Amino acid sequence: MAKPAARTRKKVKKTVVDGIAHIHASFNNTIVTITDRQGNALSWATSGGSGFRGSRKSTPFAAQIAAERAGQAALEYGLKNLDVNVKGPGPGRESAVRALNACGYKIASITDVTPIPHNGCRPPKKRRV
C-alpha cells in the first residue's frame, strides 16, 4: 500500500520594517550584512562575492555593488528603515552607505563602531612603497 504524500507547509516570509545594516570595511574587502533589530541576518553580500578579485575588491565601487546586492535581497522582507553601523578603516565605507540610500531605504542613523584599542595589540608595520 502506497503512503499518502506528506504535506509540506509553505514557508512564510517574515516581514520586517526596521533593520540594521552592518558594513565591515577592511583594507582588503567590504562585507555588508543587513539584519533585523534582534541581529538575525536577512541578507549579506561581499565585494569578493560580487565578482571582484584581488586589489579591485577593496575599491569603493566594489563596496557599492556589494551594498546594492545586499539591499535588493533585503527588500523582499519589506524592509523600509535602516540604522547603519560602519566598522573598519576601508575605502568602501561611504560608498556602501550611499548605495543603501539609493536602494530606497530611509536611513535613520549612521554609527561608527570601529573598535579602538586602549593600547592593545601591536599594529602592522607601515608600508614602504
Curated annotation (Swiss-Prot):
Protein's UniProt keywords contain rRNA-binding: yes
Molecular function as annotated in GO: rRNA binding; structural constituent of ribosome
Coiled-coil annotated spans: none
Keyword Cell cycle: no
GO biological process: translation
Protein's job: Located on the platform of the 30S subunit, it bridges several disparate RNA helices of the 16S rRNA. Forms part of the Shine-Dalgarno cleft in the 70S ribosome.
Subunit record text: Part of the 30S ribosomal subunit. Interacts with proteins S7 and S18. Binds to IF-3.
UniProt name for this protein: Small ribosomal subunit protein uS11
